[in-house]
Amino acid sequence: METLPGLLQRPDPGALSAAQLEQLRKFKIQTRIANEKYLRTHKEVEWLISGFFREIFLKRPDNILEFAADYFTDPRLPNKIHMQLIKDKKAA
């Protein structure tokens, strides 16, 4: 395998047999379905992500990593998400 900058390696297209490739394809599909089901049943994930992006676009921080760390460790965040979930239930 060829090594790329940053020590990443390119995938070897001949490394898997046809049966293994088919098994991998099915696994990827099942994983996507499971992820979609999880996200649809956990509204709080949507609110975490949309709130995070909204704050990024509004504040446009210079240091995204620091901003993300501060955002997701904010002790008020669970309450904000909880309140949003309550608003959603009332609106439904």
Swiss-Prot record:
Output the Pfam families linked to this UniProt entry: RIIa
* InterPro entries in the record: cAMP_dep_PK_reg_su_I/II_a/b (IPR003117)
- Give every RIIa domain span: 43-77
Kindly provide the name given to this protein in its UniProt entry: RIIa domain-containing protein 1
Gene encoding the protein? RIIAD1
